[in-house]
């Protein structure tokens, strides 16, 4: 379950921190208020491809950090991958205007394929 999302320099968002509650969470608001940016940020931290257009105008990089609560199956997967396994999974992803980026899971560097394998077990976006 997604507990917290921190977004920095993504599209029109300079900094945003969102705490999600248990159960169903709904994003609502007027046109242009940033709902799609939040969904794009979630997809980005889950492993979707990034491009320069997502970086806020005037900045050189953007980042998204997501905190998930997970069960034993995800903990076992993390352990099998040689990563720190706990009830909390922290996924951090940064993308720079030069096309480079960093991905970390619980502070450990991972590649995009590993990220997608892990996050496939953490959240469903509909």
Question: Predicted segment positions?
Answer:
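Gly/Lys-enriched N-terminal cap/neck module of very large, oligomeric protein machines
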Residues: 3-126
């Amino acid at each position: 379950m997604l507990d917290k999302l921190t977004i920095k320099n993504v599209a029109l968002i300079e900094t945003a921190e969102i705490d999600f509650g248990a159960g169903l969470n709904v994003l609502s608001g007027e046109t242009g208020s940033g709902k799609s940016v939040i969904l794009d940020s979630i997809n980005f931290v889950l492993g979707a491809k990034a491009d320069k257009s997502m970086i806020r105008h005037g900045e050189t990089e953007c980042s998204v950090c997501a905190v998930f609560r997970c069960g034993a199956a995800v903990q076992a997967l993390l352990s099998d991958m040689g990563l720190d396994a706990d009830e909390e999974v922290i996924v951090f992803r940064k993308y720079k205007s030069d096309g480079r980026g960093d991905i970390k899971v619980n502070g450990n560097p991972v590649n995009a394929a590993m990220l997608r394998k892990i996050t496939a077990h953490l959240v469903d976006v509909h």
